[in-house]
Every structure is written in structure tokens, then in C-alpha cells.
């Protein structure tokens, strides 16, 4: 069996960061992390304590609720977690992200666009996945937005393949070869 498939359907349910139990990482959480410009989503800067508290608040909120960023909530989070070691909690949050981020590994075809041609803008990726899975299954938007991200993405890819889309998944051997090359480059 393809390792990312197994990883996306077999997740730990005991992720706890800043003494709060996190929900399975969902498209709703990723959308909110993106909107909040979270360093945990973009990875462009090292997160601050405030970034971790915001990310934890987001990842404890179900669709369609909005995360509670009120001063009262953030102060309560601070009081509950002020003795926590920030680096340890950040490592735990990154472990949580990695546990649920088991997406299909696809071969990407190079895009060749004539010079001067306008870049096309499609649906935001999270919305595209939600509409695809809802349209293919009849499941409610709430069910799909709250579904673990790996599962939703795998369903999306599977339905696309069933509809005849050309999707080229990486094999186990190809993924291992890519990992070996990355490890070799990292040592250089």
C-alpha cells in the first residue's frame, strides 16, 4: 500500500499543544492558517509564541465556527500555558502538522505558457477540494471541511481519477529514490 494513503487515514488523536487537545488537521484549519499568514502554514519565518497560540486556537475550531481571537480567549490561553516550553510546544505542533500532512505525491507536469500570456487564476485549493468531494459524495460541506486534510485530498484525487483525469501518482520506489537524492544533497 502507498505509505501516504495509510498515513492519511491512520492518524494519532492525542495531539496536545499548549495543554489543549488539537482536532484532526482539516482544510478549515489550513484555510484559517493561510488567512492568518501563519508561519506554520508558509514556513517563511520562525514562529513567535503569539503565532503558536493563534495556530493552536485555529486547530481547535470546527467548521463553520471562526476561531476565537478575543483578548479574553488569548489571555486564558496564556494563563493555561505560560509554563510551557515554547520550543517543545513548537516541535509538538510541527509533529501534529506532519502527522496529518500525508498528501498524494504527484508528478508535476511542466507548464509551458507563451510569453505575455496572463496567468490563470483558479479556485483556492481548499475550496476546490471541498467542492470536488462534496459533489462526488453528497457529503455536507461541514463534513468535508472538518475531515483530516490527507483524507480529503486523497478522496479528491481518487474522484478526479475516476472521472478520467490524468493523475500520475509517485510509486513507493520513486518516493524512496527522491528521498535518497534529497538526503544526499542535504549532506553536501
Enumerate the predicted regions with their spans.
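An amphipathic, hydrophobic-aromatic interaction surface with interspersed Lys/Arg
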Residues: 1-50, 54-63, 73-167
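Extended accessory and catalytic-adjacent subdomains in large enzymes
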Residues: 68-71
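Accessory, usually C-terminal, subdomains that scaffold auxiliary metal cofactors
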Residues: 159-188
